[in-house]
Amino acid sequence: MDMVAHKTEDGREQYLFEHTQNVAELCSHFAETFRNADWAYYAGLLHDLGKADNTWQKYIRGEKATSVKHSEAGAQYAFSKMNSKDPAAKIIPYLIAGHHAGLPDWYEGSGNSLKSILSNIDIPYLEKLLTSPDLQELRNAEFPKSMPFGKNDLTKDNAQELLEHFHLWIRMLYSCLVDADFLDTENFMTPNKSEMRGNYASLSELKQNFDSFMSEKTANASDSKINKIRASILQSCRNKAKLAPGFYSLNVPTGGGKTLSSMAFALEHAIAHDKKRIIMAIPYTSIIEQTAKVYKYGTDNDEEIKKLIKENKCLFGEENVLEHHCNFDFDNDKELSYVIRQKQKLATENWEAPIIVTTNVQLFESLFNAHSSSCRKLHNLVDSVIILDEVQMLPPEYLKSILSVLKGLVKCFGVTVVLCTATQPALEGTIGSDTASFEGIPENMITPIIENPIELAEQLKRVEINTDYSKEKMTNWQHVADKLCEYEQVLCIVHTRKDCRELHSLMPEGTIHLSALMCAEERSDVITEIKDRLRSGKSCRVISTQLVECGVDIDFPIVFRALAGLDSIAQSAGRCNREGKLRHGTVYLFNPPSNIPKGQLDKGANVTKDLLDSYRYNLELTPKLYKEYFSKYYKLLNNFDKCEFDSLIQKEKDQCKFQFRTLSDKYHLIDNVYQGTVYVRYCSLRTGKNNISLLTALNAGEVDRQLFRKLARYSVNLPKKDITELLKEGRLIEPIEGVFMQSLDDEALYQAGLGLVADSVQSFATYIF
């Protein structure tokens, strides 16, 4: 009787030899991109060896109620065929043992360790599994011979250098295996779903769209100074794209057109060097929504989008741009057809789309994750162009692991990385101080796209920094409010939610409040309202936390910024006179009446104070000053390896002993240990849309992945101690363990225009954003 790998509800069976052969071939195809197809093929052949067990066969045929573990047998067999003292003997076992449960630790840590799996191997049992005639190819399979990374010219020196990235090579092989396994299983079990994959436009076709779009945009643009500068930046990007793959920096002041210019570079570079896709990683979801719209349609203006769709004049089109972040609801995007929605849902699993717009969290947590679902996409990073937008926002406490993995992607997997920012951080050479330092990107390894960023900064200077209010603390928030009321259109950015709420309460009616106490759906509504008011010349006073700083295309004549790090000040300046319509806008730097939160914010502000003293309060936002700022700032930090990347991954890399799962559990760019998510009640004043039906379903326990995806737009993060307090008061309920929502009987907890309001709970208001 033929052995079965899968069985559908209607009784169709996929034989084990067929599945393992399919997975081996697809897996090896994926790994050809980094010249290790033989490793992938071998892993694919052996990955389901455990399904040859008679007990498992009875289970799949419905003759036995319980299953047995099937992932360990292939791992043990591969290990038994090698010298157990050879570190390379562990490689295939990592892949196979984790192909369902996730990459394991070598030592006991989080879950079953690989060491324990390989310590008790029953050779007669494994040989018995291979007696079936349809597993003959598994018995005859040869152990892989290609060198890691496909480097057949390894010397002792460069092999030692590449060891830093050995874990990444294993992750890439693992990604090939789990994606191939998922895809072949899907193809058999749900062929209709499988048929929706692929069939994207090529990057060459998308470049033609882009060139036509930019030609028309340029032809219709006014002959202003700023548009001429943007055109020059665009041309620099196109010129440098022909150079060799590697690290590049795009150092352009805010408002210089980085979104489109960086894409111009990426498209030209990808076609010149046969890259497969372009990935734009961004720090905030609010920027992603805006950027994804620009790439899909050519604009982020909703009315213009409707017109472009009707006229079939979209830039890359909805089907070719994958927007992947926690707040994106495919089913709620009315612009997308059903087929495109389903196709994009599938593409989030393995990033097969040509253009991907995602978060830093999604990108880097996937690169250090151990779970199969998160790792599927990794092999599609090979031979890609990754644009890191607002690179200064990379969290310093994870910088060591982030720069290490970026170096590995560039050096070993054909990736080109573009570091895109208005405030280029110091990421080259030794970073930090004597007490805490590490080696960043090697000196002179980053190619600047802009030859003279200092001259460009001068050309694009559109604001004056007024430091009159920064020398002494302002007396109180009323003093700040009085200053703001002198202007009809003004943006004020403060440090914390508490400061934002307090200052807003002192402002005239009609002043807009913006903070992360408001759900993403309302923040989008508010940003649209701000743009409408500014566009029509209406009064527009806004009090916001720093979430408005990065990439939100709003243009105020006057901006007030609470004293902060120089990078934050520069980002605030990017919301001022953005289009250069005034001779210059003014950014007022002020010393707030409240204390600056301790930690990175406080340290950044202290470096700025030192620079203000050094430059006699005459602050010019130049690349030279940013370099000085970041160098001093990093020297104040005492930890660049919060996740313990060194001890968990690098310490015993030469022995191939990795704590994959423990690192995965520790790797959270946004610290959720002390915070929880609350789903709130919101009705849009702009569209009339509300989420009552979603909350009702959640309250009734009618939950699935799609419901949580929809609800993500209506969530607010709070400290867990405040969630506990609100639960006691009955203002929050917990319909499912660990899931919190606003009580359906409490209409006052969330208020449009303010967000979550709870006077009895004070501590949550001190959080930034």
Residue ranges and their predicted role:
Residues 5-10, 322-334, 494-499, 511-531, ...:
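Conserved helicase motor
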Residues 423-485:
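Interdomain hinge/linker at the junction between the two RecA-like core domains of SF2 helicases
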Residues 244-266:
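Walker A/P-loop
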Residues 276-300, 325-328, 426:
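Conserved Walker A/P-loop ATP-binding site and its immediately adjacent core
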Residues 360-364, 374-412:
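SF2 helicase catalytic motif II
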Residues 301-368:
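Inter-Walker segment of RecA-like/P-loop motor cores
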Residues 1-12, 16-212:
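Accessory nucleic-acid engagement/destabilization modules that flank
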Residues 410, 478-487, 493, 498, ...:
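C-terminal helicase lobe and adjacent C-terminal extensions/tails of nucleic-acid helicase motors
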